[in-house]
């Protein structure tokens, strides 16, 4: 009989929960079957190879204090909040079958009268009169002796907000990569009103034990206990760093324009790995040297607010008589970059 292990996270910190996944994947005994259940505060989670500027409405996220997190697995951008339960399965590679995990989820949902169906490799659907709608998406990862499968279960997420955070301003961005396809989604409460995270956790653990015909060792993980694990602390620091969240981005272009005190400004940035690789400023500003200094000071800088402020500070130092107008340019740029 295989050993069964269940981890339940009491933390709502997205970077810590994703770091816990990494710790489970790299450090636990791969011969056991593991289930990790967790949820996050309001967070947009993007895939390993996605562009946050292209996938997310960063301005709205900043205003409403929504976290950004990046997975180590592929797939598209998703929105997490406390009405969204996340699952992670770890299995020995030789016995791993995605269908097993899907069956565990479906068996748990039957408790609430919900009949799910699988679609393709990643999505789980529930039928509606106007067609099936997605309530879960997932991603996968493996190495020589273990396989990893994680995903989301939409319980009662505010789907309007989800659309807002995952809808970029199309006027501002032209990314080289393909943007995520927004599938039609549904909450499980639309089929089973009143379903909540604690109920899902209870039924998922029971379904996990029933499927493998055993009793699982259940362990609750808190923020305090997780921080005591050195490997986990290292993973947390990496997954919450600017370099991981924003620097791990392929080349893309970002255009912004506005009428300001010093004239009309039309900035074209070329960004790669979170750095300003090149830029061009089109403007009717009457101070050409200021434009040259702006261009040179911004080129090569990190594409984030503090780096832009540092660059503009040096330009303002050279052109003190234009300090007010340059401060306006600075605030406008930082608002558009929004990190």
Curated annotation (Swiss-Prot):
Coiled coil region boundaries: none
Any one GO MF annotation of this record: lipoyltransferase activity
Gene3D superfamilies documented for this protein: Bira Bifunctional Protein, Domain 2 (3.30.930.10), CO dehydrogenase flavoprotein, C-terminal domain (3.30.390.50)
Boundaries of every BPL/LPL catalytic domain copy: 29-216
Originating organism: Bdellovibrio bacteriovorus (strain ATCC 15356 / DSM 50701 / NCIMB 9529 / HD100)
Protein name as catalogued: Lipoate-protein ligase A
Listed CDD domains: LplA
Function description: Catalyzes both the ATP-dependent activation of exogenously supplied lipoate to lipoyl-AMP and the transfer of the activated lipoyl onto the lipoyl domains of lipoate-dependent enzymes.
Biological process terms in GO annotation: protein modification process
Residues given in the record as ATP binding sites: 71, 76-79, 134
Record's catalysed reaction(s): L-lysyl-[lipoyl-carrier protein] + (R)-lipoate + ATP = N(6)-[(R)-lipoyl]-L-lysyl-[lipoyl-carrier protein] + AMP + diphosphate + H(+)
PANTHER family on file: LIPOATE-PROTEIN LIGASE, LIPOYLTRANSFERASE 1, MITOCHONDRIAL
């Amino acid at each position: 009989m295989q050993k069964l292990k269940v981890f339940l996270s009491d933390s709502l910190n997205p970077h810590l929960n994703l770091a816990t996944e990494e710790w489970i994947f790299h450090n636990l005994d791969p011969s056991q079957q593991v289930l990790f259940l967790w949820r996050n505060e309001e967070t947009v989670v993007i895939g390993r190879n996605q562009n946050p500027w292209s996938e997310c409405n960063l301005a709205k996220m900043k205003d409403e204090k929504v976290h950004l997190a990046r997975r180590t697995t592929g797939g598209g951008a998703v929105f997490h909040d406390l009405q969204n339960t996340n699952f992670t399965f770890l299995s020995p590679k030789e016995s791993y079958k995605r269908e097993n995990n899907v069956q565990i989820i479906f068996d748990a949902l039957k408790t609430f009268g919900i009949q799910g169906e699988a679609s393709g490799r990643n999505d789980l659907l529930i039928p509606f009169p106007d067609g099936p709608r997605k309530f879960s998406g997932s991603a996968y990862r493996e190495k020589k002796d273990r396989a990893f499968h994680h995903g989301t279960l939409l319980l009662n997420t505010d789907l309007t907000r989800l659309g807002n955070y995952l809808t970029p301003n199309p006027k501002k961005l032209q990314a080289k990569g393909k943007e995520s396809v927004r599938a039609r989604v549904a909450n499980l409460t639309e089929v089973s009103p009143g379903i909540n995270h604690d109920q899902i956790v209870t039924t998922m653990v029971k379904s996990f034990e029933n499927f493998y015909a055993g009793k699982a060792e259940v362990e609750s993980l808190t923020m305090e206990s997780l921080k005591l694990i050195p490997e986990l602390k290292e993973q947390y620091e990496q997954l919450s760093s600017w370099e991981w969240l924003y620097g791990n981005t392929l080349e893309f272009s970002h255009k912004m324009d506005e009428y300001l005190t010093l004239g009309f400004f039309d900035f074209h940035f070329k960004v790669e790995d979170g750095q300003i690789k090149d830029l061009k400023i089109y403007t009717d500003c009457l101070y050409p040297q200021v434009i040259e200094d702006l261009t040179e000071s911004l080129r090569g800088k990190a594409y984030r607010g503090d780096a832009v402020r540092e660059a503009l500070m040096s330009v303002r130092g050279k052109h003190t008589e234009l300090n007010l107008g340059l401060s306006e340019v600075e605030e406008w740029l930082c608002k558009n970059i929004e990190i």
